[in-house]
């Protein structure tokens, strides 16, 4: 673990910074408004999605619950997975995703990942983030910031090689 006592960067507006950094990382952010319907917002971002997985009761647009599958290979072909983030980091737009599913592949195998995040649960930097998870007991967790991307020796950028092609964070 890094030295968490260091003075790290603090932002005047964590929400604004988070959104800007997420966009720079190739992700999308949407701030829910009081009149918004969460399922309609998801459908607006992913109108062509046929296979939407989620174990969250409020996600009525889900076509299946990944926890009910017998084999994680059945997740292959998932267009969108909808998950809850525990908190976000303004510094790098990373969201802490503790394992809330039977199979952790849910976070990586779908073409797109929608992360629901309480906008009040933003920290400034990774020092604050590590302090939040240091004493917690997680079987698995991952920080995710934007879509998966990699580049080869010729610097050809490829999205979705090791995870979702698109990541949308819906700030509630």
PLM ranges: what are they?
Residues 1-172:
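The feature marks the mature, well-folded catalytic cores of soluble enzymes
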């Amino acid at each position: 673990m890094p030295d968490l006592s260091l003075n790290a960067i603090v932002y005047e507006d964590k929400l604004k910074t988070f959104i800007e950094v997420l966009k720079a990382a190739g992700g999308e952010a949407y701030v829910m408004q009081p009149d918004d319907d969460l399922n309609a917002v998801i459908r607006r971002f992913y109108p062509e999605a046929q296979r939407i997985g989620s174990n969250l009761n409020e996600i009525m647009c889900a076509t299946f619950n990944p926890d009910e599958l017998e084999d994680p290979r059945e997740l292959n072909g998932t267009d969108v997975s909808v998950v809850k983030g525990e908190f976000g980091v303004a510094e790098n737009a990373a969201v802490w995703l503790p394992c809330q599913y039977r199979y952790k592949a849910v976070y990586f195998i779908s073409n797109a990942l929608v992360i629901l995040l309480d906008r009040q649960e933003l920290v400034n930097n990774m020092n604050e983030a590590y302090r939040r998870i240091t004493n917690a007991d997680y079987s698995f967790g991952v920080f995710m910031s934007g879509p998966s991307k990699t580049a080869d020796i010729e610097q050809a950028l490829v999205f979705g090689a090791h995870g979702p092609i698109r990541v949308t964070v819906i700030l509630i």
